[in-house]
Structure formats: structure tokens, C-alpha cells
Swiss-Prot record:
Name listed for the protein in its UniProt record: Putative manganese efflux pump MntP
NCBIfam families: PRK11469.1
Family from the record: Belongs to the MntP (TC 9.B.29) family.
Organism: Pectobacterium carotovorum subsp. carotovorum (strain PC1)
GO cellular component terms given for this protein: plasma membrane
Gene that this polypeptide is encoded by: mntP
Gene Ontology molecular function: any one: manganese ion transmembrane transporter activity
Amino acid sequence: MNMSATLILAFGMSMDAFAASIGKGAVLHNPRFRDAIRTGLIFGVIEAITPLIGWALGFFASQYILEWDHWVAFTLLLILGGRMVVEGFKGSSDCRCEKVKNHSLALLVCTAIATSLDAMAIGVGLAFLQVNILHTAMVIGCATMIMVTLGMMIGRYIGPILGKKAEVMGGLVLIGIGCNILYEHLGYAA
């Protein structure tokens, strides 16, 4: 996977956390920049670790399904992207954007884990594509840190407008990446 595909994947994966951080930023009366950085770091570190875990799980199984690697990656991205799109169209009952005044470390870690489960599944798919997982995980973590920090700072202004649309956009990006992987592996790319 080249750098532009890695960046697209990373920012696509960060949309879940971005949507959650907009909600968090909207809940806090006046989020400080250091709160946004702290939240971004927590989300970024967790989002970087989970694809490594998924990759390790997928790597051990890769010898059994190498012939189907592109189908596995495509299916995972399609399911995850589709789920993000569906959740983006759901009503405001989404627990990740819940208006909770508590900005504790435990709450942030729980939210970060909840939004990073997709990254673990992506890690499984990446094991079949034989990518540099450390590089990819670092890019995913950095992209998530940037997007969460931005989401926190602008959340109180655009939370009601963009919160769910960000998740839909992220889901569509993942579906597009899955289609591109399938397209390339079926021999249509030059």
C-alpha cells in the first residue's frame, strides 16, 4: 500500500474518533487546547495499538487464506464502512456523542477503545496485504490524534451540523478503499 492509500485509510479510520470528539468538544463548555491535545493523544495511541493487535491475529491466519486476501480486506472494509454509514444516519441516540460532563481519563479511554475497534479489524485485513504494519499504525495514530484534537476544538461550533456526517464520510472512504483493493488485486490496475 502506497503512502497516499495509507493516508486515506488513516484519515478514514479517524472519522469515527473525529465524530466522537466533536461530541466531546460540544459537551465541554469551553474546551482548552491542552484538553484537546490530551484527548487527541489518548485516542491516537489507542487507535495505533489496535491495528497492531488485529494484524498479529490476522498474520497467524494468513498462511491459510492468502488466495483470498483481497476478498478478506474488501469484505472487512465494506462491512466496517457500511456500519459507519448506517451509524452516521442513525438518530442522536448514539452513545459516543452522549452529553456527559465528566471528562475523566477512564471515560476518554473507554470512548477511544470503542471507536478503535474498527482499526483492529482493519489490522486483520492488513495482515493479508503484507503492508508495513508499524508504519501504517503510526500513520493511523497520528491522523487520529490530529482529527480528535481538531474535533475537540471545533466541536461546540459544528457538532450538531457535522457530527454524524463525519462518520458517513469516513464509512464511504473505507468502502472506496475496499473497492480499490479488490480492483487492484483482480488485475485491473496497471
